[in-house]
Amino acid sequence: MELSETYACVPSTERGRGILISGNSKSDTILYTNGRSVVTLDLNNPLKVSIYGEHAYPATVARYSPNGEWIASGDVSGTVRIWGAYNDHVLKNEFKVLAGRIDDLQWSADGMRIVASGDGKGKSLVRAFMWDSGSNVGEFDGHSRRVLSCAIKPTRPFRIVTCGEDFLVNFYEGPPFKFKLSSREHSNFVNCVRFAPDGSKFITVSSDKKGIIYDGKTCEILGELSSDDGHKGSIYAVSWSPDGKQVLTVSADKSAKIWDISDNGSGSLNTTLNCPGSSGGVDDMLVGCLWQNDHIVTVSLGGTISIFSASDLDKSPFQFSGHMKNVSSLAVLKGNADYILSGSYDGLICKWMLGRGFCGKLQRTQNSQIKCFAAHEEEIVTSGYDNKISRISYKDDQCTNEESIDIGNQPKDLSLAPLSPDLLLVTFESGVVFLRDGKVVSTINLGFIVTALAVTPDGTEAVIGGQDGKLHLYSINGDSLTEEAVLERHRGAISVIRYSPDLSMFASADLNREAVVWDRVSREMKLKNMLYHSARINCLAWSPNSTMVATGSLDTCVIVYEVDKPASSRMTIKGAHLGGVYGLGFADDSHVVSSGEDACIRVWSFTPQ
């Protein structure tokens, strides 16, 4: 089985803080982080993605070495890992640099030194070290609070500038680096500092809405970005143009601005770029930016990445987005197998198209969390953690109608009957709720702890799984259930049940890592010994032709079984998703779509043996 497409997660963002993305001008790729993943994304083809997931803690920042061969990435534990940018991402070194989170790091132009800054938790807040040995190259005094950004002058004589939450901009000479002077021109957090490509100047931007330009060799103040047309909110990030004559800034006022920087260091506004936002709310605040070759990249708080062309700023930007949190549910739309709907637990539903990637976010009227969902043609049903079921009708990317129904209990699982679209069954801790046309018509207590559910498309039969590992088969008559049989095989609580598309079988899986395929008529096991996961099974899917079953697990693997062959002749994808697989679906008989804890969606192609 091989990976055919990855729809990448978007950068992790935080309200009130900027993110510092970086790139490699030779390969036209950018680097950003989400959770424990470091994502390398091609600006010319966002489907060309590589993900590094070896950090033990959430990664915060990543930078290419000057020659583009190595990447240094830092995480919240203060560790910096240096690894190969290509092929197998071989680890070169790992150093414990700070006692707390790393917020920024930079390579020196000769690729020999790295400076990192962040939160020292009472110890040093900045450290510069040799990239191969980790030995210190200087003392960095002068800061009293978290250091949000650092920069190394790209030309000799080397200089290091740092800035942070104590409103200070500190200047160090070296190597070995030592404190030279401090500037107190800003009156709020200083969020980002960057040197011009020729090293003659550097600029700092701050939450006081100011940008100040300094001499790169002496740290003397040269000028400011003009306040007449300035930002009306905190400035979170700044990036120089490749020729060093302009800078790009992004702000909480939802705009990006390009400034002309004169030789004497004053900045006048050239253009204001308005990134067309989707929400109109705080999610449109811009928190990160990068100017690389002809690409001007901005990132919003909601994770939307906009790519402008620097040579044609009037052209509307190419925009795409995705998930920031665990993608816990996934549905391949049967009527149109090219479309995939995915839901993450923060309440975001995205639409994807095979071969094209991101197609839009569904604009919901209520952004409640999503625990599980079911989709059918133009309707989605979701359940969260607030005892409510939401029925969402959508057309294109717009939700035309969203209604919430309080069922009085915490929903565990839900199932639609597509051929009887007014019927919806929802399980809770001790029973099942019938909903018809958006109203609760009956609540049935089943007398055991319920964990999973599946209903036939015509709404005449249901399988309900229990905490005790038993499968209860019921026939549905009107709004009541009649128990027909109890199947015993599982040794753990049932986690998921699915009927095959031809309705001749159903498959069940449990928290004790076993899956079973059952014949629906004889109620005998059709495929057993599906015991190849090493942790609980979270999700399960059938191929459209009903010959294959795929299972996804907390152990990060996806396993595809052919029903007519022994379980041992399985196909396995190891490490499909960092942190575990939570959503699965078949696009067709040779493509499996998976989603997981890493907020990514992947399409795998295979040939049945």
UniProtKB/Swiss-Prot annotation:
CDD domains on file: WD40 (cd00200)
SMART domains referenced in this protein's UniProt entry, alphabetically: WD40 (SM00320)
Placement of WD repeats on the sequence: 2-42, 54-93, 97-141, 142-182, 185-224, 230-269, 277-318, 322-362, 445-484, 489-528, 532-571, 576-609
Alphabetized UniProt keyword annotations: Actin-binding, Repeat, WD repeat
Superkingdom, natural source: Eukaryota
GO MF annotations in UniProt: actin binding
Signal keyword on record: no
Tissues showing expression: Expressed in leaves, stems, flower buds and flowers.
Matching SUPFAM superfamilies: Nitrous oxide reductase, N-terminal domain (SSF50974), WD40 repeat-like (SSF50978)
UniProt xrefs under Pfam families: WD40
Gene Ontology annotations for the cellular component aspect, listed alphabetically: Cul4-RING E3 ubiquitin ligase complex; cytosol
Chain's role: Binds actin. Enhances the F-actin depolymerization activity of actin-depolymerizing factor (ADF) proteins.
PANTHER family (alphabetical): WD REPEAT-CONTAINING PROTEIN 1 (PTHR19856:SF0), WD-REPEATCONTAINING PROTEIN WDR1 (PTHR19856)
Name of the molecule in the record: Actin-interacting protein 1-2
Gene this chain is encoded by: AIP1-2
